[in-house]
Regions:
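Residue-level detector of flexible, active-site-proximal loop/helix-junction positions
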Residues: 1-2, 82, 102, 160-162
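Conserved phosphate-donor/acceptor-positioning beta-strand/loop module used by diverse small-molecule
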Residues: 51, 69-93, 102-113, 119, ...
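ATP-dependent small-molecule kinase phosphotransfer cores
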Residues: 1-70, 81-87, 121
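Short, flexible, mixed-charge acidic loops at enzyme active sites
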Residues: 8-13, 108-114
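Signal for well-folded cores of large energy- and translation-related assemblies
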Residues: 21, 39-40, 68, 90, ...
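NTP-dependent small-molecule kinase module
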Residues: 120-183
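Residue-level recognition of specific faces of alpha-helices
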Residues: 4, 15, 59, 77, ...
Length: 183
């Protein structure tokens, strides 16, 4: 959603771009408005995936309010050490044309989706990532406690192979649906 806002070129998109490139986080009000607007669209009625939201307790509370009367919210925390985060992001690339993310494998630096040039993401510079990790520990880590007592909260080991992480997430979603629990 943030990348879409940036690509839109609107004043809000330009503001979002400046904040992200500086390693900051979007304030709760703007972020919640972006998310609830998107989740209110018809294609989200069958289900949705939020990556990186909520990031703060107030955002989580707004999401809880939005979810009233809807199917249970499954919350998955993908646990990963700071060292592994830094390692992975150091090799992450993005297509200049279509925005597709890719890993630097040393092969042809062209996007597999559109053929565009792959470049390092501005917001993945080491100092920016370290700043984001500091902000994460201060603002986002408390969400683990906020959600941990709920039956639909699951923690997944993010250091596994991507397919194994995905499988564990799918199992968590299926287990929550089977139990009919609510977050």
């Amino acid at each position: 959603m943030l990348r879409e806002a940036i690509r839109s070129g609107t004043p809000l998109g330009r503001e979002v771009k400046q904040i992200i490139e500086g390693g900051g986080l979007i304030d709760d009000g703007v972020m919640t408005q972006l998310v609830t607007d998107r989740l209110g669209q018809p294609d989200a009625a069958a289900g949705f995936w939020l990556d990186g939201y909520p990031r703060t307790i107030p955002q989580a509370q707004c999401l809880d309010e939005f979810m009233q009367g809807r199917p249970p919210l499954v919350v998955v925390d993908i646990a990963l050490s700071d060292a592994e985060v830094l390692h992975r992001l150091a090799s992450r690339l993005v297509c200049e044309e279509c925005g597709t993310n890719a890993q630097d494998t040393g092969a042809d630096p062209r996007c597999h989706s559109c053929g565009g040039r792959l470049v390092p993401r501005v917001d993945d510079a080491d100092t920016i990532v370290r700043n984001r990790l500091t902000v994460y520990r201060r603002q986002t880590a408390p969400l683990i406690e906020y959600y941990s007592g709920r039956p639909a909260f699951h923690q997944v080991n993010g250091a596994q192979l991507p397919d194994d992480v995905t499988l564990e997430i799918i199992r968590a979603i299926e287990a929550t649906r089977a139990a009919g629990s609510s977050a």
